[in-house]
């Protein structure tokens, strides 16, 4: 019963409202608030009232302005970085070593015979063009041509041309091996894209690759280079890529350098190791590669001391006498330090170790710790990235390099209908080659130079929130020395596991020694933390309010209370106005007063 009476009183109180007018409520607030300023507005004389009203309004505006800046700063989610340096026991990095040449020439010579003959003849033609006018280049059937039996099947797919720019407005294009009249001295079609990579106006002739689309609307682009050697090398790589794309993976592995031939000696700390401690992986750019301490099938190794005596020591034999002449112009080993279970992208992140040297690499580990959403758009494991990671077939962790290449391969398949040889394949896709996909080189070159496709991949891929980078300090010395080279052990295989039946000798042009170790300070941690937190925001808001108006949280509650009272009064006034309007409409519908009881009785009797 008491509870019912209480709710009835509450209902009546709500219907009645605060019991003040707007003016009375405002005067009551100014007289009772703990905020400085409003009290003086109602207690001082007319002049001071105006002054205090102006000051209160000014400082209140300053408070709201400062609050806006603080809230905007907080919502920007800025970060601050901290740096720490020291030495601690850490995982030794995974070390990937490859030969600069992806294959042994002795094992792929039969595949490249036609291409090598074309390359040799093309170089001869280019050399001839240096000594005569470009338009007088000899045709294929000339008696002066030394290569009359060339098979031009590969050449017709992707030819090399000379571009004579004696007249810049009308450049003349000459095929090195002209097979019909349509190509001799032809000028580029107006619909063809402009010649790319023209960097030197002084040179009258340039060597370029002619890449054509053979679809319904034929179109050609010309990729020209600053040097003939560079043009021939890029052309050779493109042609050989098409050839090797048709070879099964198990056969290409057999064509490369085997671990027992390449890794002669291994020592980690004081423990001996061998090629059996390396995990093989096939890399399209460098053939067979071998990873030490990858941590994929075994526990990662740790290092607790700085210096070369506690690191990894390797002796490698690159056998550069078996390099592919036109494919590999660099002799040495390609190596990369990377995190465990991450894929080594040697073409972009690897370094070369020169043959005939002892290369010492001091390692400093950079640990990057980024804040996640909403402070940055990084990803923890790539699960929130819209690009399918094609490198998952290696059971490796996510990286932005893997994402960018997977994105490019997906666009390559979508645009060209096949996949590029340098990247893993999506399911159900085959590698591009000139026989099955005659337009692939044109399509690949167009896609590679497309800014829109490139930007799409950049926008789709995310950086990892936690990343490890290895900074290297590299020093080199000749190895072996002239005196040591005379030692007997330098004239025979350095490992007992090597085939002793072969009369194999080693020379400084094919042998490399590597020392990889942690420096005195082996780690540097760069970590991000939130520059603004909710605690910072509340304290800053309170500080500004207290400084300008002497207020506190209770003052804000008081202000909130009067706002509620204002709204309450407004609702009641609107409600009363609605009731009055309804009554007026009712009176307008029935203008006469209702009859009394006696009038109703009299009317009934008269009936």
UniProtKB/Swiss-Prot annotation:
<dbReference type="GO" id="GO:0006883">
    <property type="term" value="P:intracellular sodium ion homeostasis"/>
</dbReference>
<feature type="disulfide bond">
    <location>
        <begin position="403"/>
        <end position="461"/>
    </location>
</feature>
<comment type="function">
    <text>This is one of the three pore-forming subunits of the heterotrimeric epithelial sodium channel (ENaC), a critical regulator of sodium balance and fluid homeostasis. ENaC operates in epithelial tissues, where it mediates the electrodiffusion of sodium ions from extracellular fluid through the apical membrane of cells, with water following osmotically. It plays a key role in maintaining sodium homeostasis through electrogenic sodium reabsorption in the kidneys. Additionally, ENaC is essential for airway surface liquid homeostasis, which is crucial for proper mucus clearance.</text>
</comment>
<keyword id="KW-0894">Sodium channel</keyword>
<dbReference type="GO" id="GO:0002269">
    <property type="term" value="P:leukocyte activation involved in inflammatory response"/>
</dbReference>
<dbReference type="GO" id="GO:0002283">
    <property type="term" value="P:neutrophil activation involved in immune response"/>
</dbReference>
<feature type="disulfide bond">
    <location>
        <begin position="407"/>
        <end position="457"/>
    </location>
</feature>
<dbReference type="GO" id="GO:0055075">
    <property type="term" value="P:potassium ion homeostasis"/>
</dbReference>
<feature type="disulfide bond">
    <location>
        <begin position="98"/>
        <end position="289"/>
    </location>
</feature>
<keyword id="KW-0812">Transmembrane</keyword>
<keyword id="KW-1003">Cell membrane</keyword>
<dbReference type="GO" id="GO:0015280">
    <property type="term" value="F:ligand-gated sodium channel activity"/>
</dbReference>
<dbReference type="GO" id="GO:0032341">
    <property type="term" value="P:aldosterone metabolic process"/>
</dbReference>
<dbReference type="GO" id="GO:0035264">
    <property type="term" value="P:multicellular organism growth"/>
</dbReference>
<dbReference type="GO" id="GO:0070254">
    <property type="term" value="P:mucus secretion"/>
</dbReference>
<feature type="disulfide bond">
    <location>
        <begin position="378"/>
        <end position="465"/>
    </location>
</feature>
<feature type="disulfide bond">
    <location>
        <begin position="418"/>
        <end position="432"/>
    </location>
</feature>
<dbReference type="InterPro" id="IPR001873">
    <property type="entry name" value="ENaC"/>
</dbReference>
<dbReference type="GO" id="GO:0034706">
    <property type="term" value="C:sodium channel complex"/>
</dbReference>
<keyword id="KW-0472">Membrane</keyword>
<feature type="disulfide bond">
    <location>
        <begin position="416"/>
        <end position="443"/>
    </location>
</feature>
<dbReference type="InterPro" id="IPR004724">
    <property type="entry name" value="ENaC_chordates"/>
</dbReference>
<dbReference type="GO" id="GO:0032094">
    <property type="term" value="P:response to food"/>
</dbReference>
<keyword id="KW-0813">Transport</keyword>
<dbReference type="GO" id="GO:0050891">
    <property type="term" value="P:multicellular organismal-level water homeostasis"/>
</dbReference>
<dbReference type="GO" id="GO:0070062">
    <property type="term" value="C:extracellular exosome"/>
</dbReference>
<feature type="transmembrane region" description="Helical; Name=1">
    <location>
        <begin position="51"/>
        <end position="71"/>
    </location>
</feature>
<dbReference type="GO" id="GO:0035725">
    <property type="term" value="P:sodium ion transmembrane transport"/>
</dbReference>
<dbReference type="GO" id="GO:0009897">
    <property type="term" value="C:external side of plasma membrane"/>
</dbReference>
<keyword id="KW-0406">Ion transport</keyword>
<keyword id="KW-0968">Cytoplasmic vesicle</keyword>
<dbReference type="GO" id="GO:0071468">
    <property type="term" value="P:cellular response to acidic pH"/>
</dbReference>
<feature type="topological domain" description="Extracellular">
    <location>
        <begin position="72"/>
        <end position="551"/>
    </location>
</feature>
<feature type="disulfide bond">
    <location>
        <begin position="266"/>
        <end position="273"/>
    </location>
</feature>
<dbReference type="GO" id="GO:0016324">
    <property type="term" value="C:apical plasma membrane"/>
</dbReference>
<dbReference type="GO" id="GO:0050699">
    <property type="term" value="F:WW domain binding"/>
</dbReference>
<dbReference type="GO" id="GO:0003014">
    <property type="term" value="P:renal system process"/>
</dbReference>
<dbReference type="GO" id="GO:0070944">
    <property type="term" value="P:neutrophil-mediated killing of bacterium"/>
</dbReference>
<keyword id="KW-1133">Transmembrane helix</keyword>
<keyword id="KW-1015">Disulfide bond</keyword>
<keyword id="KW-0407">Ion channel</keyword>
<dbReference type="GO" id="GO:0042045">
    <property type="term" value="P:epithelial fluid transport"/>
</dbReference>
